[in-house]
Amino acid sequence: EFQRRVVHPYENGKISEIYRIKAVKETIDYLINRGAIITLLSHITAVGSFEPLLDQIQEILGTKNFSLFENIRKYQGEEINDEEFAKELAKSFDIYVNDAFSVSHRNHASLVAITKFLPPYAGFLLIKEIGNLKNVLELSKEGKTLIIGGAKIDTKFPVIKNFLDKAESILIGGAVANVFLKVSGVDIKKSLID
């Protein structure tokens, strides 16, 4: 079995945010308990390596019963959604489980093209996150506030635009807010801007 997930920030050789790893534990445990042999696939910056983080990931997940594919973004075919790359990637697996809502909008080989070669399934976290979004979208606009932050305005702006008529107010923070502040003439000093 093959699972797509993002391992998040690390500093000084240590994982600094373990929430995302813990969040996929339910799916991993479910698959392992049913006899699956799991390979986790993820990215960690464009050039980072998982090798120094493997022990920490195993400790967080409470198991060593998986293999960890090296940083998928190191491979040339990944970000261009190369079908030949996806076909090669898929050869060793029987199914594909996506538990990575945060990157599911990307047109990458390990998210899109691979589903042409393996039966795709949603992991428990992905199902939960889609359900949460569905619930928010079904709520009345009145009293609804969207809070959005982080970096990569190119991925956040379509979300903001989509929610303009679905939320009463939108609060923007992080590097996304810095873009709006800078355009408005505010001196953001050395703050991150995307």
Predicted regions and their residues:
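Active-site loop-to-helix "anion-binding N-cap" substructures in soluble metabolic enzymes
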Residues: 1-194
